[in-house]
Amino acid sequence: MSALPLEAAGIVTDALSPALPHEPLPADVVHDGTPGTGIRELGAFRDVELGVWEMSEGAAVDTEADEVFIVLAGAARVDFIAPALPSIEVRTGSVVRLTEGMRTLWTVHETLRKVYVA
């Protein structure tokens, strides 16, 4: 899908519907199952990137970007490996702040879709 021209005010995009094609995750990051991820970049606004990201059921580690995200659908547990922080459960409506370089383990119970600002 093409990027949404965010500089054009008044444009609407549906972040829940189009299907996002998933790519399998590399074996060295997968901890359980066969999760895949898909992304749709929506563009940039004032030097900030916006997009929709999705992960299917399973568990995988990630090194995070500096971002804020809002969960649109699904459910997951996020374990913080570094820095060591308490685990969180996220679901539809959750708003989370991550910082660049955080190491996390995502255990997705129900395919998770989020809008991110990074």
Where are these regions (language model features)?
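A short, N-terminal "cap"/entry segment at the start of jelly-roll beta-barrel domains
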Residues: 1-51
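Conserved short histidine dyad/triad with adjacent acidic residue
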Residues: 46-64, 100
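Short, conserved beta-strand element in jelly-roll/cupin
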Residues: 63-78
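Short, surface-exposed beta-strand-loop junctions and turns on beta-sheet-rich folds
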Residues: 68, 84-86, 113
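A generic structural motif
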Residues: 79-81, 117
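Conserved catalytic-core motifs of eukaryotic protein kinase domains, centered on the activation segment
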Residues: 81-83, 109
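Short acidic-glycine-tyrosine-enriched beta hairpin
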Residues: 83-101
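A short hydrophobic beta-strand segment most commonly corresponding to one strand
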Residues: 97, 104-105, 109-118
